[in-house]
């Protein structure tokens, strides 16, 4: 099969766009800042399509299943995996920040820190308790969930709709076929939007460098380096071990989603590739039901990069302000973050809000220390988003294997590059709905 010219590869186009964005932002900062609408516009286009894509994917997956008990089993296995791996991420961040000590020697007095920037950044949002978080999953109305684009609310509606459609049996064939056609149209729209990915990546990167400057990285470079190193360690050591135990390579997996990772790098948003990740995980052999449940849910419960960031940032603040922490206090911090990290999605300024709430709950760490990392948070968000994206992708394959809903032959064929299906098109739907109806 003849390969497309290099310049037509989305991977090459996005990479070139990021480089051009960095150059423009560095040498012409005002022009770089002016490119912000390009990045914002691309992310809004993607967010526009996320809710209906999730709805169609989950409904078709559940309605087409013969054994409905598998849906509950898959959901339970997914939550178990999320809890184990996100806990590992918190522990990895805690251990490495203690070993590398990026904040040691800064000797900053918390009383001298200007906290106005923190108030401005975290003011619009607030942390919610566990009960309120769970109640917020139930939308005011079905229309409201889609209007707000709340992923968990849309997921709840999709699961209920899928179960109801399944119970209709043959009477639901017309609705099933209609949703299938809508799904195909939606993925065609996704393919069209993704052609603008280089423009979005260029705009977002030009703005970031133009506004904050490459020089702003140098002052807190040790923390940046430690965080990126920890994320790499987590991906290739922790997730690498998990993938090896489940029969595939994390290196090949990362290579398989390289285009999506470049888009995430350019936009600093893991949501920007959610529709493509749904499609690509299906193309790897994971069943639609598993992918439709695991990927969207992972955006709230499996934020590995965010978990690493939370422990590292908290201990960094303690080190920088010479605030001593005993082993018991670090264990307490870990326990608090196990709870608060689950509310890190869907909130404006979520990283700082969750971190501020956690520092307040622990009690002995200065919340004012958040101002130390505010300036470089935008650069750290890229590593968070990349780690979150890879983590959720791996989760969908692992949970699919646990649920016996994974075509392993297809998985290895795709990862070894033996097939060249377009990721922008959804995997052909199985004939389970048809066979179930005729039975």
UniProtKB/Swiss-Prot annotation:
Membrane topology: Multi-pass membrane protein
Annotated stretches, region: Disordered: 415-439
Cited NCBIfam families: PRK01663.1, PRK13027.1
Residues making up the signal peptide according to the UniProt record: none
Cystine pairings recorded for this chain: none
Keywords: Cell inner membrane, Cell membrane, Membrane, Symport, Transmembrane, Transmembrane helix, Transport
Classification via Gene3D superfamilies: Sodium:dicarboxylate symporter (1.10.3860.10)
Molecular functions per Gene Ontology: fumarate transmembrane transporter activity; malate:proton symporter activity; succinate transmembrane transporter activity
Subcellular location: Cell inner membrane
Organism expressing this protein natively: Verminephrobacter eiseniae (strain EF01-2)
Gene Ontology CC terms, in alphabetical order: plasma membrane
Entry similarity comment: Belongs to the dicarboxylate/amino acid:cation symporter (DAACS) (TC 2.A.23) family.
Chain segments annotated as transmembrane: 10-30, 45-65, 77-97, 145-165, 185-205, 223-243, 290-310, 332-352, 353-373
GO biological process, any: L-aspartate transmembrane transport
Pfam families per UniProt: SDF (PF00375)
UniProt protein name: C4-dicarboxylate transport protein
The encoding gene: dctA
Role of this protein: Responsible for the transport of dicarboxylates such as succinate, fumarate, and malate from the periplasm across the membrane.
């Amino acid at each position: 099969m003849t390969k497309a010219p290099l310049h037509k590869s989305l991977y090459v186009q996005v990479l070139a766009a990021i480089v051009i964005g960095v150059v423009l932002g560095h040498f012409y900062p005002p022009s770089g800042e002016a490119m912000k609408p390009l990045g914002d516009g691309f992310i809004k286009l993607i967010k526009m399509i996320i809710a209906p894509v999730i709805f169609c994917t989950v409904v078709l997956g559940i309605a087409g299943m013969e054994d409905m008990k598998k849906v509950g089993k898959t959901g339970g296995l997914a939550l178990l995996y999320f809890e184990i791996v996100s806990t590992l991420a918190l522990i990895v961040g805690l251990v490495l920040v203690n070993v590398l000590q990026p904040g040691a020697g800064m000797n900053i007095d918390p009383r001298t820190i200007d906290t106005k920037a923190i108030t401005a950044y975290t003011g619009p949002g607030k942390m919610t308790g566990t009960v309120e978080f769970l109640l917020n999953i139930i939308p005011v109305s079905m229309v409201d969930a889609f209007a707000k684009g709340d992923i968990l609310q849309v997921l709840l509606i999709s699961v209920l709709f899928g179960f109801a459609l399944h119970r209709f049996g043959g009477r639901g064939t017309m609705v099933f076929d209609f949703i299938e056609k809508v799904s195909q149209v939606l993925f065609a729209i996704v393919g069209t939007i993704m052609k603008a990915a280089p423009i979005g990546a260029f705009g977002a990167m030009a703005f970031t460098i133009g506004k904050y400057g490459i020089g702003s990285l140098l002052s807190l470079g040790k923390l940046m380096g430690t965080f990126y190193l920890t994320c790499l360690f987590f991906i290739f050591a922790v997730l690498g071990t998990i993938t090896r135990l489940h029969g595939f390579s994390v290196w090949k997996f990362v290579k398989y989603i390289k285009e999506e990772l470049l888009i995430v790098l350019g936009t600093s948003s893991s949501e920007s590739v959610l529709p493509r990740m749904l499609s690509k995980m299906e193309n790897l052999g994971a069943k639609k039901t598993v992918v439709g449940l695991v990927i969207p849910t992972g955006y709230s419960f499996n934020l590995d990069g965010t978990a690493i960031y939370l422990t590292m940032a908290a201990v960094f603040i303690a080190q920088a302000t010479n605030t001593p922490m005993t082993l018991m206090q670090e264990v307490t911090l870990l326990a608090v973050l196990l709870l608060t990290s689950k509310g890190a999605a869907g909130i404006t300024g979520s990283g700082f809000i969750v971190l501020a709430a956690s520092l307040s709950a622990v009690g002995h760490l200065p919340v004012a220390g958040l101002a130390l990392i505010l300036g470089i948070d935008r650069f750290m968000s890229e590593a968070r988003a990349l780690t979150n994206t890879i983590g959720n992708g791996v989760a969908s394959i692992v949970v699919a294997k646990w649920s016996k809903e994974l075509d392993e032959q297809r998985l290895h064929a795709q990862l070894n590059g033996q097939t060249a299906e377009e990721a922008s098109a959804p995997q052909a739907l199985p004939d389970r709905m048809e066979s179930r109806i005729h039975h």
